[in-house]
Curated annotation (Swiss-Prot):
GO biological process: thiamine biosynthetic process; thiamine diphosphate biosynthetic process
Source organism per UniProt: Syntrophotalea carbinolica (strain DSM 2380 / NBRC 103641 / GraBd1) (Pelobacter carbinolicus)
Residues reported to bind substrate: 66, 95, 124, 164, 186-188, 227-230, 266, 293
Pathway: Cofactor biosynthesis; thiamine diphosphate biosynthesis
One GO CC term, this protein: cytosol
Subunit architecture: Homodimer.
Protein name: Phosphomethylpyrimidine synthase 2
Length: 430
């Protein structure tokens, strides 16, 4: 039985117990939410060293880090270091999006490197193999090659796979009729639309969705239903193509649940601040409360080099409104492949957004951390502040580099004129 099937039969599995303990939630409550589809336990039966990850309603907002090679940078060592840095920085999951070099070897090395939840987009490799190994165009892929690629990733232990099943001929027609500035910016979505247009055929992952469900079920992996029509700029947000795809994903969610397979839904993208909450409400309604996994959202299009900040702003609003899983964006977004420092900075920025949202959600223990930090600050207790900081190493480093005079105990911003010290001096001396 799958985790969903066990949950529906009232069985609390070992994976549920482990994931619940890691999340700080009662295992029976987690089971109930898995049964209703509002939470998942993400773990492939083939991922021997992986820890099950609980995502969804009433759980900590999760953070994913995307890594992976490109044709221009195929170093396995670089990607393994990014994986290590992402986990050390607090990422809950890692997606390998490699499109260059020995892709199988890279994915297997990343899976072996960490216990973190691992995701991938099998279509990327299917497309790359078609071009590099077979000398054909992406549009010449066969449906069997797409499904064979999915099976290979599942065999390797990938815990969740992004599949662009909601990219359909009817959605393409709506996009073309309404018009967009940036058309399709999802890489997997663009591959699929190009294939459909060239072959004048429906998306195999939609047309043969039952085949996909049968393939995934023995692994008990999670389907991450990709948003091929996510907006790539603010002006394209919340248009007909995006929402039509979301309606389809809601239908596919129910079909997956009927087959005993866990699902989460992927979301935008680039979205103006005043539209983010509405996007979350639409997803939760149309997709029946399934966990929502959003990329950002980025709240402006003009900040290349700072898109980890635009992502964190949107991510905090989205998660505060009910999004469950935030995919980070790094400072290199829209510019180049991220380096190791970019990965660290992206994870930290998105963790800040996730924590801010957990306070809004009333997650047990979230606000308590901030209260403890406030008390340590008032008492000029620097060691406790370092321990409570989201990035202890950076906090210690910046203070240490400042040349602070430890005799007054404050920092170089105020020194002896520190407000805490001034207020402390007005207290009666014992």
């Amino acid at each position: 039985m799958t985790q969903l099937e066990m949950a529906r039969q009232g069985i609390v599995s070992d994976k549920m117990k482990q994931a619940a303990a890691d999340a700080g939630i009662d295992a029976e409550i987690l089971r109930q939410r898995i049964a209703e589809g509002t939470a998942i336990v993400c773990h492939n039966n083939m991922h021997a060293n992986g820890r099950p990850l609980a995502v969804g309603k009433g759980l900590p907002t999760r953070v994913n880090a995307n890594i992976g090679t490109s044709k221009d940078d195929t170093s396995i060592d670089n990607e393994l270091e990014k994986a290590r840095v992402a986990v050390a920085a607090g990422a809950d999951a890692i997606m390998d999006l490699s499109t260059g070099g020995p892709i199988d070897e890279i994915r297997r090395a990343i899976i072996a490197e960490t216990q973190a939840c691992i995701g991938s987009v099998p279509l990327y490799q299917a497309a790359c193999d078609t071009v590099v190994k077979k000398g054909k165009a992406i549009v010449d892929m066969t449906a069997d090659e797409i499904f064979d690629g999915i099976k290979k990733h599942l065999d390797d232990g990938v815990d969740f796979i992004t599949v662009h099943c909601g990219v359909t001929l009817s959605t393409v027609e709506r996009m073309d009729n309404e018009g967009r500035i940036m058309d399709v910016v999802s890489r997997g979505g663009s591959f699929t639309v190009a294939w459909m247009t060239h072959n004048n055929a429906e998306n195999p992952l939609y047309e043969q969705y039952d085949r996909l469900l049968e393939l995934v079920k023995p692994y008990d992996a999670t389907l991450s239903l990709g948003d091929g029509f996510r907006p790539g700029c603010l002006a394209d947000a919340t248009d007909r193509a995006q929402i039509h795809e979301l309606i389809i994903l809601g239908e596919l969610t129910q079909r997956a649940w009927d087959a005993g397979i866990q699902v989460m839904i992927e979301g935008p993208g680039h979205v103006p601040l005043n539209q983010i909450e509405a996007n979350i409400q639409l997803q939760k309604s149309l997709c029946h409360g399934a966990p929502f996994y959003v990329l950002g959202p980025l709240v402006t299009d003009i900040a290349p080099g700072y898109d980890h900040i635009t992502c964190a702003i949107g991510g905090a609003v989205a998660a505060g409104a009910g999004a469950d899983f935030l995919c980070y964006v790094t400072p290199s977004e829209h510019l180049c492949l991220p380096n190791v420092q970019d990965v660290h900075d992206g994870v930290m920025a998105t963790r800040i957004a996730a924590h801010a949202a957990d306070i809004v959600k009333g997650l047990p223990g979230a606000m308590e951390k901030d209260i403890a930090m406030s008390k340590a600050r008032k008492g000029l207790d620097w060691e406790t502040q370092y321990c409570l900081a989201i990035d202890p190493e950076l906090a210690r480093k910046r203070r240490g580099e400042s040349g602070v005079d430890e005799e007054h105990g404050a920092c170089t911003m105020c020194g002896e004129f520190c407000a805490y010290k001034v207020m402390d001096e007005r207290k009666p001396k014992q």
